Amino acid sequence: MTNYLLEIGLEEIPAHLVTPSINQLAERMEAFLNENRLKFDKIIKFSTPRRLALIVEGLSESSEAIDEEVKGPSAKIAKDAEGNWSKAIQGFSRGQGATPDDLILKGDYYYAKKHVDGVKAEEILSKVGDEVIAKMTFSTYMKWGNNDFLFVRPIQWIVSLLEDEIVAFDLLDVTANRFSRGHRFLANVEIELKNANDYASKMPENFVLVDAEHRKAEISAQILALASENNWQVTLHKDLLEEVNNIVEYPTAFVGSFDPKYLSVPAEVLVTSMRDNQRYFEVYNQEGQLAPNFISVRNGNAEHIENVVLGNEKVLVARLEDAEFFWKEDQKLKIEDLVAKLGKVTFHAKIGSITEHMARTKLIAAKLADIAGLTDEEKVDVARSAEIYKFDLLTGMVGEFDELQGVMGEKYALLAGENANVAAAIREHYMPTSADGQLPETKVGSVLAAADKIDSVLSFFNVGLIPSGSNDPYALRRAVQGLIRIIEKMNWHFDLSLFIDQFEGQNHAEILEFVKARVQKLLLEKLDRYDIVEAAINSSNFDITNMMESAFVIDGHKLHEPFKPAIENVSRSINLVKKAADIAEINPALFEEDTEQALYDAVISLQNQWTYKPCEEKFRAIVHTLAPAIEAFFDNVMVMAEDLAVRDNRIALLSEVVALTSVMADFSLINTK
């Protein structure tokens, strides 16, 4: 067993592409080795902004020898009319190094038995350039030199070592060898690697921490140590830590500061300037107040660190000066003046202005406020917030820091005298900003956020701007997923079709299928029964909360003894009703059996209270009240009676069963086998 090292040296890779790139390289290497039957124990990944590297441990010296059968021509064309081997069979056998007489007939085809010898690891690995590296794909490419080769960034060097032997191959004008390179500034020299096993220990000696997880742990430890020394609190934000880790090869954390006068600017602005724009970690005192300091990480050692600190402070102060200016100037603006100007700001060229979008959102929000049971005072707040909630788009601060949309709206609204509910709704209407992001906390904010998302989705669908495949430029999938999460959290019950009707020419089915797909995705992240999820999302009305609750309730009963017969009896009813051309009115006078009357009575008793029953109670009623009555009905009644009036009456009775149960789910889609 041997170890193999592959290192691809590159120009600086964008931070967000480093981790996906090394993961892809490892996956492609694993697939390549498996395809070539070259066994190994594990693949260890290394990555920095300038290199992607792998060590394959426990590699076999050669690939596995195998005996295989190769499928050839069919028996129908194997011989000619005289019984001689055909040209097709002769050509096939020749290609396999055999004679026609060596072939084996299995069923309708001839097969050649073939022994495939093992291939030396060196020979297989010499194809890594073409079969692994050249086949990598990226969201962003670069082209260099006079060729058509594309890669994430230009390749500068390649190391390819099987233990202490070079496995040579060429990729463009780069020949794989044993020479890596150190840190760009601290050790900008070639580093000779005598053995693949030297990599992890040799590179840190040249100021390159190639192990990304070790480097991240080192960054975390340094930041926490500096925070502790200064009695600060600091949060190691996951995404920021990942980004910083992927822009340095040899990290050294340091402390910087800024004038406390800038603390008069809202903390969110300062944090955005530091964290999002400069990749700094903000720090807080022990009372949880933002301190006029930050922690950052340089790509180098502590030499001349004071110059690095001054440079970073200077860059930050420039941004804080802008922030302070906008904060003061924006407070001179009036909300009503900014709202008036939104009529000239385009929401989308095919849809209209932001003012028009807000007007539609206000109408939707009013309906939602009724559905949500808001108080009259809350409804006033919903209306007011819907009238102004986009005003901060025209402030200087949001123009400079667009990440602060909504956040600044809340602050400026409070300064202008708007009440807390209205101000909070302005901030919360963007929520959630990610798949698992925070949801609005207030009722008014929840209504506004949902209404804004409903109008956005319906508006884009109305003009034909519909997501296809992975293409979703207007983030409509995210909007719908956020809408679903808000509706579920607030436990709102309403049919989404109510809001689609306000748009002329809407393709209702297309929109509902789009939303249904998002509900399905969310449910399948939590439940393992696809059929139960399908049944729930195909209920007779488009009540998202009902769909979600139904799926969980049905799934919770799937192992109970009455589950199977109950589902089968309801499904039988559904299938019979589906076959009926027309459904008549029920006439109890046509009942001939007691079980018909009993089923009718069960349906009527449930109908009177069905709308307001929770899903759990609905399902228990279906299992324990309705299903036994259906079973008795089927045991004692011939549904397809010769008397057409009696037959139609029985189908009509079953249609009422279906109407009742389908409010919860389409039970015919559940597999009981």
Curated annotation (Swiss-Prot):
Protein name: Glycine--tRNA ligase beta subunit
Reaction catalysis annotation: tRNA(Gly) + glycine + ATP = glycyl-tRNA(Gly) + AMP + diphosphate
Source organism (scientific name): Lactococcus lactis subsp. cremoris (strain SK11)
Family statement drawn from the similarity comment of this UniProt entry: Belongs to the class-II aminoacyl-tRNA synthetase family.
Domain of life the protein comes from: Bacteria
Protein biosynthesis recorded as keyword: yes
Subcellular localization(s) per the UniProt record: Cytoplasm
Keyword Aminoacyl-tRNA synthetase: yes
Keyword field: Aminoacyl-tRNA synthetase, ATP-binding, Cytoplasm, Ligase, Nucleotide-binding, Protein biosynthesis
